[in-house]
Regions:
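Exposed loop/turn and edge beta-strand positions of beta-sandwich/beta-sheet ligand-binding modules
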Residues: 34, 58, 117
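Short, conserved charged micro-motifs
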Residues: 69-76
Length: 128
């Protein structure tokens, strides 16, 4: 399996264990979906080759959306849970993983008719 897909699948399965019925992928959920929810977004695989070896990084973006901007603590806790799942990852079926960097943003989101709170995690994993 492609390493990027293997990481994506692992995160999706583990997050669904923590938040059943609140984790989505591929497309954002329909308009009537209850908040808060997690959206496992885009991922990127980068090869870094030198003369004798290839090193790889996978970057994974995960979003948390909430329709109550006053409940920032809920978004923050969900982001923390996602980071814990990411840090606990050591191995998948075919690869050994290490979480290298995490960037976290929480911001207002006015892309819908109701104001949202939008949390974004950018996760950088190394694997071999």
């Amino acid at each position: 399996m492609d390493p990027q897909q293997e990481l994506f699948s692992y995160l999706l399965v583990e997050l669904k264990k923590l938040y059943p019925d609140n984790v989505y992928d591929t497309f954002l959920p329909p308009d009537n979906t209850p908040y808060p929810f997690i959206y496992v977004g885009n991922s990127q695989l980068i090869d870094d080759a030198n003369k004798s070896a290839v090193f790889w990084n996978v970057y994974q973006i995960i979003h948390v959306f909430h329709n109550n901007p006053k409940q920032r603590g809920t978004v923050s806790k969900m982001l923390l849970d996602i980071k814990k799942v990411s840090r606990e990852l050591n191995h998948t079926t075919n690869f050994a993983w290490s979480l290298k960097n995490v960037s976290q943003d929480i911001m207002p989101d006015t892309s819908t008719s109701i104001p949202l709170l939008h949390g974004v995690l950018s996760l950088e994993f190394k694997f071999n």
